[in-house]
Amino acid sequence: MKRFGTRSATGKMVKLKLPVDVESLLIEASNRSGRSRSFEAVIRLKDHLHRYPKFNRAGNIYGKSLVKYLTMRLDDETNQLLIAAKNRSGWCKTDEAADRVIDHLIKFPDFYNSEIFREADKEEDITFNTL
């Protein structure tokens, strides 16, 4: 059964709903990597969208468990990939993102991907000014 929402999916923000036990996996992963929870979730979502463009979910195995919320800001490419994935599945962006982050946390608990990051090679790419 496909679900269709009434809100626009073009925004770059996603409010992620994670079950409490999965959120603890995210906290552990972010502590190991030194990244924030939100950044860790975005990196994992991006990797999952590239690895599994046609993700077959097994269904919501968590039901109505307690959830924690996490707001993620997506870049343009990840947002477009997520919109395409949610259009294929018929789920909303929030559920699509949550299922993918949960699946990635379970399949790849120790995930460190340095290929996603690029070095600042131009002056305008540098975030902080030197003193």
Curated annotation (Swiss-Prot):
Name the domain of life: Bacteria
Q: Does the keyword DNA-binding apply?
A: yes
The record's keywords, sorted A to Z, are:
Activator, Conjugation, Cytoplasm, DNA-binding, Plasmid, Transcription, Transcription regulation
Q: What one GO molecular function would you report for this record?
A: DNA binding
Its localization reads: Cytoplasm
Q: InterPro entries this protein is in?
A: TraY
GO cellular component terms, semicolon-separated? cytoplasm
List, alphabetically, the Pfam families matched.
Answer: TraY (PF05509)
This molecule's function is given as:
Conjugative DNA transfer (CDT) is the unidirectional transfer of ssDNA plasmid from a donor to a recipient cell. It is the central mechanism by which antibiotic resistance and virulence factors are propagated in bacterial populations. Part of the relaxosome, which facilitates a site- and strand-specific cut in the origin of transfer by TraI, at the nic site. Relaxosome formation requires binding of IHF and TraY to the oriT region, which then facilitates binding of TraI. Upon binding to the oriT region TraY bends DNA 50 to 55 degrees. Also positively regulates tra gene expression.
Q: How does it assemble?
A: Part of the relaxosome, a complex composed of plasmid encoded TraI, TraM, TraY and host-encoded IHF bound to the F plasmid origin of transfer (oriT). Interacts with TraM, probably through its C-terminus.
The family this protein is said to belong to: Belongs to the TraY family.
Q: What is this protein called?
A: Relaxosome protein TraY
